[in-house]
Amino acid sequence: ALNCASGWSGGYDQHCYKVFDIPPSWAADEKFCKQQTSGGHLV
């Protein structure tokens, strides 16, 4: 079973997910995602 950090959802394709409400800008949002966790990416 996949164990995700508190506040994160998981299970799909063995990845954890979290929804953030932040202003749209792909480059800034990708940077934000990478800062949240190792290997994080905007999807």
Curated annotation (Swiss-Prot):
Disulfide cross-links: 4-16
Chain ranges of the C-type lectin domain: 1-43
Alphabetically ordered keywords of this record: Calcium, Cell adhesion impairing toxin, Disulfide bond, Glycoprotein, Hemostasis impairing toxin, Platelet aggregation inhibiting toxin, Secreted, Toxin
Domain of life: Eukaryota
InterPro entries (alphabetical): C-type_lectin-like/link_sf, CTDL_fold
Post-translational modification: Glycosylated.
Cofactor(s) needed by this chain: Ca(2+)
Self-association state and partner proteins as the record states: Heterodimer of subunits alpha and beta; disulfide-linked.
Protein name: Snaclec lebecetin subunit beta
Organism the protein comes from: Macrovipera lebetinus (Levantine viper)
